[in-house]
Amino acid sequence: MKTKNYLSEAQNFLKRNTQVKSFDIVMHDCNGVGRGKIIRRNELLNLYKSGRQFPLSLLGMDITGEDTPETGLILEQGDGDIKAWPIPSSLKLLHNSKPPRGELFMNMYDIDGKKLLTDPRNVLENKIQDFKKKGINFYAAFELEFFLVSNELDEYGKLKPAKSILGKRASIKKTDVYSVDHLHGMLPLIDDIYEATKLAKIDAETIISEYAPGQYELTLKHQKSLLKAADDILRLKRIIRAQARKHGVTACFMAKPMENISGSGMHFHISLYDQKEKNIFAERNNEKINKNLNYALGGLSLIHI
């Protein structure tokens, strides 16, 4: 893998952002956890020229960051090296970071330059190519639910919803679903999230106060690039975490961080279209049921048999 063609991307970024002194270089494992390093400004161009080596076991860690011996990547293979390369167009300026910093995402390859199939982004890219060979394209979007929790635990040592930033109004036992007033209490944080997504060229749209206390949902605009949609949702989680820390609260994306109240999910909306921009599941010529839809339903049914 060579990214010399994209070297100008890094050069132009450095020229435009002379105040940036360091960069987060981030890869995502199979659990969606961002792993990587912080590099200094003087290392960026060489990263684009030569890549950066990482241990192979990085791809086999569990959600807590522990090695998983069952993968066979540790003792059996001696935890060899892989090489990470910058993903084109992923170099972004981080909002509200002091001193100013940048961030870029990385893709993983073996030492010979072949894409690693254990990199989840490479897996997705291969599947997209399979669909393209069949003349199928996508529209996709995510809706992300999350909690904003206090940095302090309750009297029982458990998580509790964060108080509003403005006014410090507590919402520990009160559900404020669709409450605009509740959102107003978090406006400084919400505004920073929107500013950060704008810098990252992520089309963030509606935010609501969700059903559980301290729970929110932020939607992203649908787009044709399924790969960018996946990159955007991973970056959005990093943005929300970072901006929450700036405002003295913690963002939590766990499915069920607090018992006895609703948990969080992540809705993924996807539509499949042919080369003429027509939905492949739509009925045509007065047919009773579209054959593609019939096959899709059959495939989903087989999963549960």
Regions of interest found by a model, annotated:
Residues L144, E210-L218:
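Short, conserved phosphate-binding/catalytic loop or strand-edge motifs used
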Residues E125-I128, Y194, K237, R241, ...:
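Generic solvent-exposed, charged/amphipathic alpha-helical segments
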Residues N151, S209, K256:
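Residues that form or immediately flank small-molecule/cofactor binding pockets and catalytic motifs
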Residues M1-T206, K228-D232, V249:
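ATP/Mg2+-dependent ligation/transfer catalytic cores
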Residues S225:
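Positively charged, low-complexity, intrinsically disordered RNA-binding extensions
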